Amino acid sequence: MATAVAHYAAAAATDRGRKRPSNEDAFGLSVEHGVYVVCDGMGGAAAGEIASSLAVDEMMRLLTSRDGAHTLIDDAEEAVASANAGIYLRAQHSHNLSGMGTTLVTLLVEDGRGWMINVGDSRGYRMRNSRLEQITLDHSLVEEQVRMGRMDRLEAQRSPFKNVITRALGTQSSVTPDVFELENEPGDLFLLCSDGLTRELADPTIEWILKLDLPLPEMCARLVEAANDAGGHDNITCLLVRAEA
């Protein structure tokens, strides 16, 4: 009989990077409630920072105060809609916040089950049996072109449109997130991150760091350090969650 997941452990780190004047990333986590969130804000002035913080705060508020009347994924989709509406309405009523938005990647766990939810190009990965796999699909112009076979990976990396995302929270009155259902096993290691990590580090490099099997806070620090060493062109956020027997 397969060993069941008994509990989870988590750690996170965020850093401004070496080029940006401020950090517009945000994250939230609650091991008790099985809720983990990373957001990467965008917009002029402090708008990106406001958008990402609003999204994280709303996701955490709603998903750590559930009454059990609905399924976890139903509550999560409602939380995404609420976060989107809050950012959108705030931007409509503040001229200096016009156009602000944020990406979102969320991991939800409940016993041995899990769900990843994403909007934008912040990613969710799973490491199982020493193999790293990207679970989410980037909502970005170049990644969608790659998936349709209209552009290869090298062309995507060189494209002037590589930073253009096709979905975000708060830029429209409604948004449709992608949802991925997971069956978790002891030893699974999940990574949620902003593109400040994945634009600097290729997946094999991330996999190599995670294979070091260090304490979670130390692995988060190693990931941030490696991204900064590679240039640190953007804010960097990583959140690790491990399923344990």
Task: Give the positions of each predicted feature.
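PP2C/PPM-type serine/threonine phosphatase catalytic domain
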Residues: M1-A245
